[in-house]
Amino acid sequence: MDLQHWQAQFENWLKNHHQHQDAAHDVCHFRRVWATAQKLAADDDVDMLVILTACYFHDIVSLAKNHPQRQRSSILAAEETRRLLREEFEQFPAEKIEAVCHAIAAHSFSAQIAPLTTEAKIVQDADRLEALGAIGLARVFAVSGALGVALFDGEDPFAQHRPLDDKRYALDHFQTKLLKLPQTMQTARGKQLAQHNAHFLVEFMAKLSAELAGENEGVDHKVIDAFSSAG
């Protein structure tokens, strides 16, 4: 059975059993992560079925950002994937299940589980790249809006004189997590892409800063200077 067969099997199952997830964790997200993972894996001798499966099930359990057990999401997702592969996909190669589950458990930023295989490193990078760039920008404000989080602190949007708090202000999430992601990348290509996409977020911050100052045609170069080295 080839990868296209398994991808079709997974998508069909998810469309019937995973329909009510937010846009940051839906089937389209899984598909994008898989597309990115294929690019990251292009020059490596890796098990693509392990990567495909982990990409499609890494968020099969995804607790809300404000859930007290949020950091356990990837562990719970790995446990659920193990069950699903054994019970719902009986023809899936049993010898690959633990490698899939490790890649899923290790993908999460909050779980802090080190990826020990090349497959797990690729899945982690592919998922983290989704948090950067234009898609990442859209996701931040979509998720924050759903949680009732303010866009930014109008008095101090970049937290120059206050502690960062991304539970109150969506923009703070750029500094608490997103701009740090390039430093966590496991693959050379992943790091390169992460730095490129993080720069897009910095440019957004610079444009926002200019607009808040009443300047609608330029960007705040002080913001670019302050944050461009974050990755």
From Swiss-Prot:
SMART domains recorded for this chain? Answer: HDc
Top-rank taxon, per record: Bacteria
Residues in HD domain copies = 26-132
Q: Which PROSITE patterns match?
A: HD
Q: Transmembrane residues, as ranges?
A: none
Q: Which residues form a coiled coil?
A: none
Record-given protein name: Uncharacterized protein YedJ
In the UniProt record, what gene is named as encoding this protein? yedJ
